Structure formats: C-alpha cells, structure tokens
C-alpha cells in the first residue's frame, strides 16, 4: 500500500495489483475517503508530517497512523518505519497544536510575520536516527495489519537451502 497511490479498494495498475487501504486493520473508511479527497484537493502528500497536518481533524488518530506505518504506506517517501513509529505522538501532537493555533489566528514558531501565520515550507521533519526494524519484524507488521506478507515471506530466507533438494514423483 502507498499513501499516495492506493485507493480505498484494490486496483490494477500497469498489470500489478495495488493494495486497497480498506484492507488495512485499524484504518476506517471515513479516514480513507477524507484522505482520497485531500489528495485530489492538495495533491500527493510529500512528507509524513505534512500528511498528519493535512489530515488532522479527519478521523485521524494514533491507531490509524500506526496501522498505515506498519502496513508500509509511507515507505516510498524514504522513511524508516521504526523512526516513524517512534515519532507518531510528537508529529500528531504538533499537527493538532498547529491546527488549534490556526483556528485562533496565532502564528506558529515557523511563521514569518508577513506570511499570514502559515508555516514556512522550509521546515523539515526530523526523525530519530535509528536502525530499521529487522526484515522479519517488517513482514510480521505487514501480516498483522493487512493479513498478508507484502514485501517478503518468512520462508524467503530458506529458499537457497531448498534449491539443491530434488524430488521424484511417485505414481501408485
């Protein structure tokens, strides 16, 4: 699944099956519909924190965001899932705080006096520098949230061991 390319339901894209967002456990249909509307209006999401800001107030909650991360929806943005998981509370809190300030007309920390209180585009999300989850942990998260192994399979590590094994068909 991809936060910018996946639709609500499964779709076929250039002969490949694109995973539907409704199949991700913990992500409601209301959030998915809002996400698709937001992509049409504001274009693709370019960063994780931008996604959280734009989707704030649209049924977005910690559980849904963590499910999207575990399913790999932000992988194509270049983030490590472990770093995102460690930053969820901070980023969601910042998005909610920014939304509250915008409602009250206050400028935020990154606003210039002449920009109407809007955040400057030069701000960039800083994530913790951590090692990524192991391959086994990543595919286990995918299986937990989608019911499928998406980027690998637990038996992949044993493929080389199985290659030299031969077999004979027996007919009785």
Residue positions per predicted region:
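Sliding clamp-binding short linear motifs
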Residues: 2-170
């Amino acid at each position: 699944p991809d936060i910018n390319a996946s639709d609500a339901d499964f779709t076929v894209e250039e002969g490949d099956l694109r995973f539907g967002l409704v199949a991700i456990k913990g992500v409601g249909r209301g959030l998915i519909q809002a996400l698709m509307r937001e992509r049409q209006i504001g274009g693709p999401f370019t960063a994780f924190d931008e996604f959280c800001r734009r989707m704030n107030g649209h049924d977005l909650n910690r559980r849904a965001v963590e499910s999207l991360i575990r399913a790999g929806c932000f992988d194509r943005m270049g983030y490590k899932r472990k770093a995102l998981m460690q930053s969820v509370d901070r980023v969601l809190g910042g998005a909610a705080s920014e939304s509250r300030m915008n409602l009250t007309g206050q400028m935020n920390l990154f606003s210039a006096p002449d920009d109407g209180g809007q955040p400057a585009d030069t701000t960039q999300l800083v994530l913790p520098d951590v090692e990524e989850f192991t391959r086994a942990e990543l595919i286990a998260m995918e299986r937990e949230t989608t019911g499928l192994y998406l980027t690998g399979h637990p038996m992949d590590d044993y493929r080389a061991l199985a290659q030299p094994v031969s077999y004979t068909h027996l007919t009785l």
